[in-house]
Amino acid sequence: MKASKYILPTEKENPADAVVASHRLMIRAGLVRKSSAGLYFYLPLGLKVLKKIEQIVREEMNSTGALEFDLPILTPSDFWEQSGRWSAMGKEMFRIQDRHDLSYALGPTHEESFSFLLKPLLKSYKDLPVNVYQIQTKFRDEIRPRFGVIRSREFIMKDAYSFHIDDSSLDDTYQAMRVAYRKIFDRCGLKTIPVQADSGSMGGSASEEFMVVSPIGEETLLLCNSCGYSSNSEKTPLILKKENGSAKFSEKKEISTPGKKTISEVSTLLGVSESETIKAVALKSEKKKILVFLRGDLELNLHKLHSLLKIADSEPMTDLEIRELGLIPGFISPIAPNDKIKVLYDRSLQKDFPYVVGSSKEDFHTQGFILEKEISGLPEFADVALAREGDLCPNCSSPLKAEKGIEVGHIFKLGDKYTKAFGIQVLDQNGKSKTLTTGCYGIGVNRTMATVIEQCNDEKGIFWPISIAPFEVSLVSIVKGEDQYSKIEEFYNVLINEGIEVFWDDRDLGPGFKLKDSELIGFPIRITIGKKFFESGEISIYNRKKDQEDSFVFSGFDDLVARVESMRQELFTELR
């Protein structure tokens, strides 16, 4: 491809609204342009990268025996009603009505559609297992799209769904997908960590996210350097490093705390650590009022709470709603007020420790409150607090380390949630009807592209892994006149005929501009032919990742091609 025939709108300045490297560089390198919040146009260079990632995904999926489909983006509301997710998906799902007032969703995921499609096609255990997938545009009405294509409202996703006669078969495919995902991300040049994760609205019994450690990540990972345990903090069981020792206040007594409603305010006033207090969190879901008590220095983990109570979402109660239950905001006692509210105690609490708690009385707290003495029939404590760095590994009890991560893939064991909802049964070996069990496996293609840039950039721009670079080789020519141009064109044609992907910057621009563009865009290999070649036969070849340039005297096209092939193989080998 010749740059003179290409759309190549590179930019010198960073876009004002771009706060992360991938967003800045995708705009500056001419890969994308913004349409509106969370929506992007893909230009030819950016589209080539996307298509290469898609092809890697397709090859690895096909190698496992998965079958590619293409389903409608519009999905009828009936499908979602049948699974119970029409309301559970909330406001993030785009919903539309046609001229006949029929409701549809712009698919954020396709469990329902594949279930509807495959129900009449799967009749016997002999038809199983089957793993189906598509690579398709998905939609999500993000409340705050940000970080460019990392969190956007429209994105390309590979979503796969497997159907099985039993859990053993499901586990075989789950493990095959786990291996395939590692291969996909390795081939894309990404270093990923599989971590245990919460299944969220997807449901199911097991779930792993493929995470890339990055300071811009929106997820917190907790990792153990001793045994290799890794988990999303949403899923990590809380095991505290140590419990409270002796308390400052052991005698039970009511204390005046005028206007002090927060844990920080109360602990500062009384001179106690936050871990010696009990925090009350009042929430409401669609059908429940919830009151959670946990140690004052900890945060509530909503994902654990929702999973435990089997609810889709919750939000804080207002002060008025709290008072209507007979409670005083900021001064709530751990004693359950009535049966109108679901009360939970986190396992971070010690039953025999004298805590500072709310007194159920305006401007008063109680010191020396011991749960097992004050609350009759104390229930079993639940794990609903958020684990943090320094808490203990659930496998080996070593301290956990926290890292930020970007999720690029996710695999689930869904069980029979959707096959039950859609009545998907087959005859087993004994001729009896059996409900199938399923798995789900997703990869964000655009997000993978952006995350590669987050890992592969420097002050000059992007340095693409050669497997997904828009072109493998950049040929930069610095010439005067038609004769010199024709000579460089001979080089270009030789490389093309050897099957090498070449982007020839033949624009009538200065050498500095061309060289900076090639480094900004991130072509893995650059060949520069200019004045020195026409004077002494000297050519330079540049490794973008190493930022290393070597010169040699041209001795023939075979030698040039051999040098390029050697560097290509070196760059591909680094991905294994």
From Swiss-Prot:
| NCBIfam families linked | PRK09194.1, proS_fam_II
Cellular component terms (Gene Ontology): cytosol
| Annotated catalysed reactions | tRNA(Pro) + L-proline + ATP = L-prolyl-tRNA(Pro) + AMP + diphosphate
Which biological process terms from the Gene Ontology are attached to this UniProt entry?
prolyl-tRNA aminoacylation
Point out the signal peptide segment: none
Q: Which domain of life is it from?
A: Bacteria
Record remark: domains: Consists of three domains: the N-terminal catalytic domain, the editing domain and the C-terminal anticodon-binding domain.
The protein's name in its UniProt record: Proline--tRNA ligase
Select a single GO molecular function from the record's annotations and give it: proline-tRNA ligase activity
Q: Which InterPro entries match?
A: aa-tRNA-synt_IIb, aa-tRNA-synth_II, aa-tRNA-synth_II/BPL/LPL, Anticodon-bd, Anticodon-bd_dom_sf, Pro-tRNA-ligase_IIa, Pro-tRNA-synth_IIa_bac-type, Pro-tRNA-Synthase_IIa_type1
**Similarity comment:** Belongs to the class-II aminoacyl-tRNA synthetase family. ProS type 1 subfamily.
Give the quaternary structure.
Homodimer.
Enzyme Commission number: 6.1.1.15
Which cell locations does it reside in? Cytoplasm
Q: What is the species of this protein?
A: Leptospira interrogans serogroup Icterohaemorrhagiae serovar copenhageni (strain Fiocruz L1-130)
Function noted in UniProt: Catalyzes the attachment of proline to tRNA(Pro) in a two-step reaction: proline is first activated by ATP to form Pro-AMP and then transferred to the acceptor end of tRNA(Pro). As ProRS can inadvertently accommodate and process non-cognate amino acids such as alanine and cysteine, to avoid such errors it has two additional distinct editing activities against alanine. One activity is designated as 'pretransfer' editing and involves the tRNA(Pro)-independent hydrolysis of activated Ala-AMP.
Identify the keywords attached in UniProt to this record, alphabetized. Answer: Aminoacyl-tRNA synthetase, ATP-binding, Cytoplasm, Ligase, Nucleotide-binding, Protein biosynthesis
Principal localization reads cytoplasm
